[in-house]
């Protein structure tokens, strides 16, 4: 009987963790097109540059802010995007506060409802990555790490973290620290962090509940 109860509890933990993973994946990121400027003809950052430096994933949303009645957002095909043809949109948004769900891993193309504005550059193309990616890090390349930074992974796998000053001063090829990776030398993550690495990310509340149940089971044995 005790074995059956413990099995049920373990099954519940697995189900809760799976539920948390599903909830986390369904909560996409909200991107504000044009930033503070909104969906305008001349934003402070060019739309193509803004799109290039961001990573878009399935279930993310694009938020278009503009003056209702004076502009609109049209989702179009790639051909119509290139020619600024606004006569056959796939989707038309005109409420002034428009949200567009990126529901699949594909390229999406948007133009202003004013064809003249589109010809002047008010158009946006985004490419949505597959669900296998779980990061919204910018796409532009980061500065190349120094040769001494490459063994950081090895340092993480060692029983105890190597002091930063020793890693920098030692002439031997011991792990070093790049300024942009200063947080990597923190204490090795626990089981919950391992789950996040495998599954993308899991709701913290669900993990906490699972750990509490594990502790309760351990006290019963």
UniProtKB/Swiss-Prot annotation:
It is a lipid-anchor; GPI-anchor. It is found in: Cell membrane. One of its GO terms (molecular function) is electron transfer activity. Disulfide bonds join 84-118. The keyword RNA-binding does not apply. Residues 198-221 form a propeptide. Confined to flowers. A lipid is attached at residue 197 (GPI-anchor amidated asparagine). One of its GO terms (cellular component) is side of membrane. Residues 29-130 form the Phytocyanin domain. Belongs to the early nodulin-like (ENODL) family. The gene is ENODL4. This is Early nodulin-like protein 4. Residues 130-185 are annotated as: Disordered.
């Amino acid at each position: 009987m005790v074995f059956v109860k413990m099995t049920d509890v373990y099954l519940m933990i697995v189900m809760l963790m799976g539920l948390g993973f599903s909830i986390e994946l369904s909560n996409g990121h909200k991107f504000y097109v044009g930033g503070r400027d909104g969906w305008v003809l001349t934003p402070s950052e060019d739309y193509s540059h803004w799109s290039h430096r961001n990573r878009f994933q399935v279930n993310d949303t694009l938020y278009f802010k503009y003056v209702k009645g004076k502009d609109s957002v049209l989702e179009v095909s790639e051909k119509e995007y290139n020619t600024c043809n606004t006569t056959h949109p796939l989707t038309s948004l005109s409420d002034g506060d428009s949200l567009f769900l990126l529901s699949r891993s594909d390229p999406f193309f948007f133009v202003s409802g004013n064809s003249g504005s589109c010809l002047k550059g008010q158009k946006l193309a985004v490419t949505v990555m597959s669900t296998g990616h779980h990061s919204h890090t910018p796409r532009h390349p980061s500065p190349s790490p120094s040769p001494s930074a490459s063994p950081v992974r090895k340092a993480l796998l060692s029983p105890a973290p190597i002091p930063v000053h020793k890693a920098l001063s030692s002439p031997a090829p011991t792990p070093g620290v790049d300024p942009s990776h200063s947080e990597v030398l923190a204490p090795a993550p626990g089981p919950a962090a391992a789950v996040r690495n495998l599954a993308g990310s899991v709701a913290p509340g669900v993990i906490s509940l699972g750990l509490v149940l594990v502790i309760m089971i351990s006290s019963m044995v």
